[in-house]
Amino acid sequence: MSIKSDKWIRRMSEQHGMIEPFEAGQVRESEKGRVISYGTSSYGYDVRCSNEFKIFTNVHSATVDPKNFDENSFVNYTGDVCIIPPNSFALARTVEYFRIPRSVLTICLGKSTYARCGIIVNVTPLEPEWEGQVTLEFSNTTNLPAKIYANEGVAQMLFFESDEICETSYKDRGGKYLGQTGVTLPRT
């Protein structure tokens, strides 16, 4: 299994729609000034989060149960900057829509800009033939409020291609998050 380069990412996105919308290079500035970088890097793709957030709250004194998740545990928020309360988390989604090839497994890692501020990004692997917008989880590990900037870089996707095609892909299994759009809560 080998990691794929910027040339491969560019070709797969421009010719096969692997990432849409796609940024062929690194963007570090916008009309608003400096931004946290996004777009194609040497061996990965830095994704942006949209301006759609679900901020965790415990006003209902609920128990977090992944098999019976209560949507009321979140406050919906739309805006350019999301403020995550201390020791809490928020969900968001990527601006980009992904179509992962059958021979590829994609791993997501947080950007150092956020990690150095105590903000951790968590995403499970994007499996072969999965497609959709990626739901992102931001954990604020600090005891201070933390900011997440919409439409700026938040995490990096790394693409690994196997030397052998898998027998059963995510699509073949009818995975429950296939084709997801928007911020998607846990499903069982």
Curated annotation (Swiss-Prot):
Active site: residue positions: 137 (proton donor/acceptor)
Pfam families: DCD (PF22769)
First-tier enzyme category under EC: hydrolase
Binding site for dCTP: 111-116, 135-137, 156, 170, 180
Pathway: Pyrimidine metabolism; dUMP biosynthesis; dUMP from dCTP (dUTP route): step 1/2
Record-listed E.C. numbers: 3.5.4.13
PANTHER family per UniProt: DCTP DEAMINASE
Family the UniProt entry places it in: Belongs to the dCTP deaminase family.
Subunit structure, as described in the record: Homotrimer.
Name of the protein this chain belongs to: dCTP deaminase
Organism: Marinobacter nauticus (strain ATCC 700491 / DSM 11845 / VT8)
Gene: dcd
